[in-house]
């Protein structure tokens, strides 16, 4: 592009073509883009457990305005009453840690009244990421070497903006078993 108008046209064409993959220009980081998407679309995010909180809190606490869209555990897993209610819901779940985590994500989202609830299940080689909404949950398994926190932030950004999730991220309706292939680490 040789002129400002041509550059603008090329930028718009790229943004239209790769809307879900592009999250910002210049110095914008993924965490800033996720917070901006939550704020722009008036969405509230909570974490259902301390593991997800650990992934997100350290990154989000440095972003201006994050407290408007993320509870930093205050209304969710760090609140003793909410934690007790979440544990009561999860203790009745059969089938192992994955269905239990899915139930915990759904319960946190409903108890707090948030738009999204994040959760994670750390395993030896990988981490299963959950991002729950009212009707279901996005699930993605990521190798620990692939920075699960950034994948979770990308899932949040895409969900808050109404964009399609990255390939390898599965939509899971509540009450249904998660397919085994969704619990295998995805590579790009």
Label each PLM-derived region with a short phrase.
Residues 6-188:
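Short alpha-helical segments enriched in small residues
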Residues 1-5:
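Helix N-cap motif at beta-to-alpha junctions
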């Amino acid at each position: 592009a040789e002129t400002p108008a041509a550059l603008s046209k090329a930028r718009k064409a790229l943004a239209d073509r790769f809307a879900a993959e592009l999250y910002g220009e210049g110095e914008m980081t993924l965490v800033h883009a996720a917070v901006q998407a939550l704020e722009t679309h008036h969405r509230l995010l909570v974490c259902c457990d301390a593991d997800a909180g650990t992934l997100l809190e350290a990154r989000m606490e440095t972003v201006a305005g994050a407290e408007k869209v993320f509870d930093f555990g205050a209304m969710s897993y760090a609140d003793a009453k909410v934690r007790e209610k979440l544990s009561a819901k999860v203790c009745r779940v059969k089938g192992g840690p994955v269905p239990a985590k899915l139930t915990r994500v759904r319960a946190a989202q409903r108890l707090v009244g948030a738009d999204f609830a994040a959760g994670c299940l750390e395993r030896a080689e990988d981490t299963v990421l959950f991002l729950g909404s009212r009707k279901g949950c996005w699930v993605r398994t990521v190798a620990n070497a692939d920075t699960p926190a950034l994948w979770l932030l990308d899932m949040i950004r895409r969900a808050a903006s109404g964009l399609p999730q990255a390939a390898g991220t599965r939509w899971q309706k509540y009450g249904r078993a998660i397919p085994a292939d969704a619990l295998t680490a995805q590579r790009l």
